Swiss-Prot record:
The active site is at D204, E230. Pfam families: Alpha-amylase (PF00128), Alpha-amylase_C (PF02806). InterPro entries: A-amylase/branching_C, A-amylase_C, Alpha_amylase, Glyco_hydro_13_cat_dom, Glyco_hydro_b, Glycoside_hydrolase_SF. GO terms for molecular function: alpha-amylase activity; metal ion binding. Keywords: Calcium, Carbohydrate metabolism, Glycosidase, Hydrolase, Metal-binding, Signal. It comes from Streptomyces hygroscopicus. SMART domains: Aamy, Aamy_C. The lineage of its organism: Bacteria, Bacillati, Actinomycetota, Actinomycetes, Kitasatosporales. Its EC number is 3.2.1.1. Monomer. It is an enzyme of class 3 (hydrolase). Ca(2+) binds at N122, D175, H208. This is Alpha-amylase. GO terms for biological process: carbohydrate metabolic process. PANTHER family: ALPHA-AMYLASE (PTHR43447).
Length: 478
């Protein structure tokens, strides 16, 4: 074991007043419903493995939701995107059958985690299904025939033309005529996965279905549950994300792009305006990356290491949007499906992330206050008197003083001690602070005490006397 100095907190607010940047607090959002608003997306995980993850990891960490990849029967192939090319609405994809899906939902519910199913309802594909039945384009026995598809039988070519985007074909896939009552009823029937206990849906490619048609589908469901829709913003495009906010939440792709710009530019101070120009906070689902963006280069990915982790810490600490933590698998071939039982990134289960899920649950709707930055790589802020976080995206340790707004007491640093406070504690009091390079510190009122902890270091609470112990804060590295 090696010992090294590491101070975790901050002190006298007046010392940093001249350098501090302030910003009006962001209001907090309230969706998805319930007190636990964080989703974990387990991309391409078999349903039996999702069930285990809910029981062993997601439930204990405090996740409110798990999002799973599409369940419907799809074309054969060794590429991940075959899951997004359905040939029927049978629960018969590579991730598990109907029984496996139902068992997963039950296990996740028992662990306190609700289930969001990724639903592909914009189009159908052609080819052999998972059970070797052959499907031809525009002919899906028991579901759809030629007349149930849009008449534009060509690929989308003009995103400034609404009709082209919503009636022509996404990568040559047969585009469902969602203006038809029959099609709407059939889609609503598939979304009857609610009968298996599913709590909500991510609507894939929602941008390519008119908001009017999607609202009509939802209106056919007695209890549609929570919806989040994939509507990617594009400058100058005809279809906008805000058209869909009356139906449900919308994935805010600009958020992940903003995070990448901030963490790679050397100026994470720009994140004080992360909500500007985006969807209203109560309607946006935020994420650092997903399976598309990690492959097209528009966001950070697991390959970015510490910056990726810090971006997730920031997302979970800040009040804008409903956060979605993505867990995929390691890849070199952008098209390749998951290889088996190894290679999963498991970001949703990492200590830094699970600790911040608890932070998010503890601070609730508390406002963002006491924003501090120096115009460069570090930042810090409080969530009223409920929580405090500091991030250092630099390559050298940061020594600084911060205003935490926390009540006096001893707190667990939850990014280093996500459970049972078995890493570091921080005592709110009076000493200077250091945050290591490429690291963060997070404290909240739901994680206090010194159970199994080795160290204490002080931070200052504005307006309180500085009488807490001083410490060199040496931490044993495990």
């Amino acid at each position: 074991m090696q010992q090294r100095s590491r101070v975790l907190g901050g002190t006298l607010a007046g010392i940093v007043a001249a350098a501090a940047a302030t910003v009006a607090p962001w209001p907090s959002q309230a969706t998805p419903p319930g007190q636990k608003t964080v989703t974990a997306t387990l991309f391409e995980r078999k349903y039996v493995d999702v069930a285990k993850a809910c029981t062993d990891q997601l439930g204990p960490a405090g996740y409110g939701y798990v999002e799973v990849s599409p369940a419907s029967e799809h074309i054969q192939g060794g590429q991940w995107w075959t899951s997004y090319q359905p040939v029927s609405y049978k629960i018969a994809g590579r991730l598990g059958d109907r029984d496996a899906f139902a068992s997963m939902v039950s296990a996740c519910h028992a662990a306190g985690v609700k289930v969001i199913a990724d639903a592909v309802v914009n189009h159908m594909a052609a080819g052999s299904g998972r059970h070797h039945a052959q499907y031809t384009k525009y002919n899906y026995p028991g579901f759809y025939q030629d007349q149930t598809f849009h008449g534009c039988r060509k690929s989308i070519s003009d995103y400034t033309n609404r009709d082209d985007v919503q009636t022509c074909e996404l990568v040559d896939l047969a585009d469902l005529g969602t203006g038809s009552d029959y099609v709407r009823t059939t889609i609503a029937g598939y979304l009857g996965l609610r009968s298996l206990g599913v709590d909500g849906f991510r609507i894939d490619a929602a941008k390519h279905i008119s908001a009017t048609d999607l609202a009509a589908v939802k209106g056919k469901m007695k209890d549609p549950g929570f919806w989040v829709q994939e509507v990617i913003y594009g400058a100058g495009e005809a279809v906008r994300p805000d058209e869909y906010t009356g139906i449900g939440d919308v994935d805010e792709f600009r958020y992940g792009t903003h995070l990448k710009s901030a963490f790679q530019s050397g100026n994470i101070a720009q994140l004080k305006s992360v909500a500007d120009g985006k969807l209203w906070q109560r309607q946006a689902r935020t994420f650092v990356d997903n399976w598309d963006t990690e492959r097209n280069g528009s966001t950070l990915t697991y390959k970015d290491g510490a910056a990726y982790t810090l971006a997730n810490v920031f997302m979970l600490a800040s009040p804008y949007g409903s956060p979605n933590v993505y867990s995929g698998y390691e890849w070199t071939d952008k098209d390749a499906a998951a290889g088996g039982s190894t290679g999963w990134t498991d970001d949703a289960a990492k200590r830094e992330i699970t600790g911040m899920v608890g932070f998010r649950n503890a601070v609730g709707s508390a406002e963002l206050t006491n924003w501090w930055d120096n115009g460069g790589r570090p930042l810090a802020f409080a969530r009223s008197d409920k929580g405090f976080v500091a991030l250092n995206n630099g390559d050298a340790a940061l020594t600084q003083t911060f205003a935490t707004s926390l009540p006096a007491g001893t707190y667990c640093d939850v990014v280093h001690a996500a459970s049972s406070c078995d890493g570091d504690t921080v005592t709110v009091g009076d000493t200077e602070a250091q945050v290591d390079a490429a690291k963060s510190v997070a404290l909240h009122v739901g994680a206090t005490g010194q159970s199994a902890c080795r160290q204490a270091v002080a931070l200052h609470v504005p307006g309180q006397s500085a009488g807490s112990p001083r410490s060199s804060a040496k931490r044993v590295e495990q």
